[in-house]
Amino acid sequence: MKIISWNINGIRSNIVCDGKLAASGVSVLDECNMKILIEKHNPDIICIQETKCPISLGEKICPDCKMYPYKYWNESKGTGHRGTGYSGTSIWSKVKPMNVLYEYMNLCNTSGRFMYAEYKEFSLINMYVPNSGTNFEYRTTEWDKNINDIINGHMEKPLIVTGDFNVVSTELDIWNPKTLEKAKSPGVFKEERDMFKLFLENYTDLYRYKYSDEKKYTWWDMRSKGRERGNGWRIDYFLLQDKYLDMVKDCTIDNSIMGSDHCPIILEIL
C-alpha cells in the first residue's frame, strides 16, 4: 500500500490549471499538479494539508472519481481571514475506512487541522500542525501535548501519523544548521523540537529510518526563492510506532511535484 502526504497550500489551484474552481465544483482533475502526482505514484491514500477549501466545495471536487471514491474533508470553523478558506485537511482513499473522526480527545480542532481514519490493518492521523509564529503558547502547551497523548494512547495497532509538523528535527533537516543553534524562529524553537523528540520516544521518523544520512527537504521559503537555491527544511513526516517498523517498505520525498511551498512525501507499507 502507498500513502502520500502533501501540504498543498491551496487545493483549488492544484486541481485546475487556471487556478479557479467554480462554486459548481469540478468533475475531473485538470492537467495540473494533483493529477501529475496521482499518475506518477498511484497512491492508495492521499493525506492533504492546508486545503484552504470549505467542505461544501470540497465535496464537489470529482464527486464521481472512480480512483478515489472515498474523500473526506475538514475545514476551519473560524470567521474572516480565518474562515473556511483557511487551513483545512482532507483524505482521499481507494479503500473505505472503518471510521473517520474530525475531533479526538481534548484536541481543539476549530481550524480543521486534524483527521483520524481507521482501517482494518492500521489507523492514520493526517494533521496540519499550527505554526508557532502565530500562537506559540497554544502550539507548545496545548496542541503538541494533546497530540502526544493521542499517539501514545494508541498502541494496540499500527498508527501512521503524517502531515506538516512545522518543526525541524535534526541538522540534516535544514539547509543552514546555524538556524537551529540560534533557535529564534518558528519551526526551530527549543520547545517545539523538545516535543517532537517526545513524539519519537515510541515512534520513528520513517524517512530518517530509511535514509539516515540524506539531506532532502520538503518545504522552501518562496519569497527568497529557497527552492531554486536548495535552501529548504524538512518539516513533513511519516511517524510509526517502533514495534511496527517491519511493515515499512520505503519512505521517500518527491521534490519534483510543484504547486506548493511543500512537496509530497510517500510511504510504502507491506
Residue ranges with predicted function:
Residues 1-5, 9-17, 23, 29-35, ...:
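Active-site regions of metal-assisted phosphoester/phosphodiester hydrolases
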Residues 52-132:
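Structured beta-strand-rich core segments of catalytic domains in phosphoester-bond hydrolases
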